[in-house]
A protein has these predicted regions:
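Nucleotide/phosphate-binding catalytic cleft detector across ATP-hydrolyzing
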Residues: 1-8, 12-14, 22-249, 275-282, ...
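A broad structural signal for short, well-ordered beta-strand segments within beta-sheet-rich domains
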Residues: 80, 258, 268-270, 323
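Short acidic-glycine loop/turn motifs at beta-strand connectors
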Residues: 23-25, 264-268
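Extended hydrophobic-aromatic, low-complexity segments
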Residues: 260-263, 270-274, 281-282
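Short beta-strand scaffold segments in enzyme catalytic cores
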Residues: 17-21, 259-263
């Protein structure tokens, strides 16, 4: 009897990081899972405690997701306390290090950081979106073998925009080019060697995974897949049999920080938009979904309301009978609960909406590593 296939899937969000240890041959319900605070939230809380105590900060590591940790570090500097950061870690706060210096941060060389680590008066925090030590320790604490045959990780990556290029425009321009080239959600997934150079956050995560493979005793050459988190959640929602059976559907992932919606016709993307969840009301979201469905939503309409953008590949003639099936997922999905658009709250195989991104990662890995598909798909489709 062959050994089961074991995959660690991690969906790194702004509020939580959702972790699934998949093992072929098990029902998906019996695979071990954790929903824990996101890396940026963990770092933010550590910084806030340093601010309360007036301790200077030393930030090293790699580029990671911003949001809460960005705001906490900014507030620490504004309170008059020192923030020293290495260049790679500094790009967490802005791709342009001159802008990081304008925030009041000191950019230092790695050698200088290594010297300052010895100072007990400061708080040293290593920035990273994938904390291999924490995950391995957590699994072993429950006598779970952390060894895996593959890793699949999702995160939101604005991309490294050139100076003067809006992060929002850069992000959506990349999305639009991807959809025009390959209009399917799994196009936003990449094997490690194929990650676009501009996706520096995903590149940094890929570098961090080597430590997990080492600590867990896994093969150092184990396949690694990286994916955009909103697309992973949408792909995971398709593991709900009712959603998968729709020929014409809207998939809307309402995350803690970003909302991403696809218009899919027979599995192919007809339109897409992305916005900041905190910047939109239910009425605005409903209006954008209707316009996405009929093909009249414009890029500028989304961008000028502080969103990222929209792309429509084909217009449709809609009426009450032909409006697409609307499936909603994400931790903020209650924004559409009770809507006149009659949203269906997608529940992927296994019954856990918070693991939708992890299920999407498994599906994407099966697409990108076809030899693994026969061991992944039976659990997803059970």
């Amino acid at each position: 009897m062959s050994s089961p296939l074991r995959i660690l899937a991690v969906d790194v969000g702004t509020g939580t990081q959702d972790i699934l240890l998949f093992e072929s041959g098990k029902t998906i319900e019996n695979c071990f899972k954790m929903v824990m605070p996101s890396p940026t939230v963990i770092v933010a809380e550590r910084i806030k405690r340093a601010t309360e105590r007036g301790r200077p900060l030393l930030l090293t590591g790699v580029t990671m997701g911003g949001g809460p940790c960005h705001w906490a570090a900014r507030d620490h500097a504004l309170a008059g306390f020192a923030v020293a950061v290495t260049a790679e870690a500094g790009r967490t706060f802005d791709d342009d290090l001159a802008m990081v210096e304008q925030m009041g941060f000191e950019i230092i060389e790695d050698a200088e950081a290594a010297r300052r680590v010895e100072n007990p008066a400061l708080l040293h925090i290593e920035l990273q979106d994938f904390d291999a030590q924490a995950i391995v320790t957590a699994l072993r604490a429950f006598d779970v073998d952390p060894g895996v045959d593959a890793l699949a990780i999702a995160a939101f990556d604005h991309g490294a925009a050139p100076p003067g290029y809006s992060d929002r425009r850069f992000r959506f321009d990349f999305i639009a080019k991807t959809v025009q080239r390959e209009p399917v959600p799994s196009a936003f997934a990449y094997l490690a060697q194929e990650i676009p150079a501009s996706l520096t956050r995903l590149q940094a995560i890929a570098e961090s995974t080597a430590r997990y493979l080492q600590l867990s005793g896994s093969d150092s050459q184990a396949p690694l897949l990286l994916m955009d988190t909103g697309s992973a959640a949408a792909l995971g929602a398709l593991e709900d049999p009712l959603v998968r059976g729709q020929g014409d559907s809207l998939l809307c992932n309402i995350g803690n920080f970003h909302t991403l919606a696809f218009h899919l016709v027979r599995g192919r993307i007809e339109g897409i938009f992305e916005h900041h969840t905190g910047e939109i009301t239910r009425a605005q979201l409903e209006d954008m979904l209707v316009k996405l469905a009929d093909g009249t939503l414009t890029n500028e309409e989304v961008f000028t309301t502080s969103g990222h953008g929209a792309l429509v590949l084909r217009q449709s003639r809609l009426n009450a009978k032909t409006f697409p099936f609307l499936a909603v997922t994400g931790p903020r999905r209650a924004l559409l609960r009770g809507s006149a658009l009659h949203p269906y709250e997608a529940t992927p195989q296994g019954g856990d909406m918070m693991l939708a991104g992890c299920y999407g990662l498994l599906r994407a890995l099966a697409d990108h590593e076809p030899e693994m598909a026969p061991m992944i798909e039976p659990s997803l489709l059970a």
